[in-house]
Amino acid sequence: MTVQLRVYVPPHPLIKHWLAVARDAATPSVLFRSAITELGRWLTYEAAREWLPTEETTVQTPLEICPATVINPQVPVAVVPILRAGLGLLEGAQTVLPLASIYHLGLVRNEETLEASCYLNKLPEKFDPQTRVLITDPMLATGGSIMKAMSELTERGVDPSLVRIVSVVAAPPALQKLNAAYSGLIVYTATIDETVNDQGFIVPGLGDAGDRIFGT
């Protein structure tokens, strides 16, 4: 039986708070950047559940030896920010995954076709098949960028079931495309909005995340 895409909207008050700050058109760039960083932190924390590789061991407490669970250092963990807006979530994600390798992927969207093309690719030629990959992309709108990113990753040996996507706002077109192409994929997002307009922006959304992060 095919496992469908799973989308989680964590009911965490800090996620809700920082989403409200990010949505507000009056939020200045410096505060918007902080909001996206915090969303990256808390959404990555949620995404790491039952995803980070662990192993059983023992530790010596001041009193006696006891069983313990630790992160398995032998299994690679990678974060792939989709440039440029994905960089906004990266700092928060790194506070949760400080030892993860960072592989930048630069994608640009054709404003007429809404299709994505790659202008920067720092992915390795091949990933270890056990690699856990976290993709950061604030807006999952039409699905062009995230589908291109998934294509680049799976071509290099990444198992879609070991991928976690962290976004701030997701919309049905992107989620439907992911569901049709990749079984077992899991998305963590602060909210799901219903509409994408003719320009490919999520409505109500939060505007152009990249422009607001970088003040351009």
UniProtKB/Swiss-Prot annotation:
Which UniProt keyword terms apply here? Allosteric enzyme, Glycosyltransferase, GTP-binding, Magnesium, Nucleotide-binding, Transferase
What Enzyme Commission number does this protein have? 2.4.2.9
Pathway listed: Pyrimidine metabolism; UMP biosynthesis via salvage pathway; UMP from uracil: step 1/1
Q: Name one GO biological process term.
A: UMP salvage
Q: Which Pfam families match?
A: UPRTase
What switches its activity on or off, per the activity regulation note? Answer: Allosterically activated by GTP.
Molecular function terms, GO-annotated: GTP binding; magnesium ion binding; uracil phosphoribosyltransferase activity
Q: Superkingdom of this entry's organism?
A: Bacteria
PANTHER family for the chain: ADENINE PHOSPHORIBOSYLTRANSFERASE (PTHR32315), URACIL PHOSPHORIBOSYLTRANSFERASE, CHLOROPLASTIC (PTHR32315:SF4)
> What protein name does the entry list?
Uracil phosphoribosyltransferase
Taxonomic source organism: Nostoc sp. (strain PCC 7120 / SAG 25.82 / UTEX 2576)
- Lineage, highest ranks first: Bacteria, Bacillati, Cyanobacteriota, Cyanophyceae, Nostocales
